[in-house]
Amino acid sequence: MIYTITFNPAVDLVIQVDQCQLGELNRSKGEAYVAGGKGINASLVLQRLGHVNYATGFVGGFTGQYIKDTLIQEGVKPLFVEVDGITRVNVKVKSQEETEINAAGPQVSPEKFAELLAIFERDLSSDDVVFLAGNAAPGLDVKAYIAIAKLCQERGAKFVLDTNKQLLTECLLYRPFVIKPNHHELGEIFGVSLKDEAEIIHYAKKLQELGARHIIVSRGGEGALLLTEDGQVFSSDIPKGRVVNSVGAGDSMLAGFVATYLETGDFAQSLKRGAATGSATAYSVWIAERQLIDDLVNQIHVVAH
């Protein structure tokens, strides 16, 4: 089974305006509510690619119910722990520029985290894959990530890690199956500015030395690099298209990669479909649909180094 964990999911309120002026009344030309969070995005992509999965984490109130309802409509199985308060609402104002206001989210108590951990202590096996995605919720810290990562290692489950620099580096010891920093984030980990492909590969290998098994480094318009555990290096380009929405593109890429690897065990094919999935989300209003992913796959070229 595949599980995704989003400690601090959100409902994203996307508002379209001609021009956003601070201190003035701004009228919306249109708005939309969507379920958000890295693990949520991964769950939706996995489901659309035919992989049944459980979405876990913490939700509360009517916004938490909205997220669960959205997932159920998509075929994802919600397995959240309910907390006091309401799941946060993040506001994204789109005009000539995009402005975001992200809420803090509800507090998660040690008792509530213990409830979530108990689910995995009861059910997790070596056949499972766990996406540990996003940042910590209020009340949680790196210990929560380490607890999940350590349990995955002990049970022999693959775990996929997509989070910030501190949380990522603290969990490398537990041998994540795959991580996906972009080239800026990779440079920040080591305090350097990466100028070319050779430098990216050099520092990605250092992350492997610290424990990561496979690493995807996304490079925006220049495509992506994949370094595998057995020393292979692949690069991909990206298909042509107009970027509509950058939110969730990286999560989609990672989900597309993992879904394809589980189906084929082929790294080149996995990178190719992962790149197509990330691009399909970037070229869509929300999370990518299967048809667009399939259309874009044939436009992508993967090269072994």
What feature does the model see in each segment?
Residues Q47, Q153, L262:
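Gly/Ala-rich phosphate-binding loop of Rossmann-like dinucleotide-binding domains
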Residues I2, H51-N53, P78, F159, ...:
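Hydrophobic anchor at the start of a short beta-strand
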Residues K150, T169, E197-H305:
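Conserved phosphate-binding/catalytic region of the ribokinase-like
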Residues V129-A198:
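Conserved beta-alpha-beta core of the PfkB/ribokinase-like small-molecule kinase fold
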Residues R48-D128, V297-H305:
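Conserved N-terminal subdomain of the carbohydrate kinase-like
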Residues M1-T56, G64-Y66:
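Glycine-rich phosphate/adenosyl-contacting loop at the front of the ribokinase-like
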Residues Q19-R27, P181-H183, F234-D237:
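Short glycine/proline- and charge-enriched loop/turn segments
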Residues L46, N182, G250:
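Short, conserved phosphate/pyrophosphate- and ester-handling motifs at nucleotide-, phospho-/glycolipid
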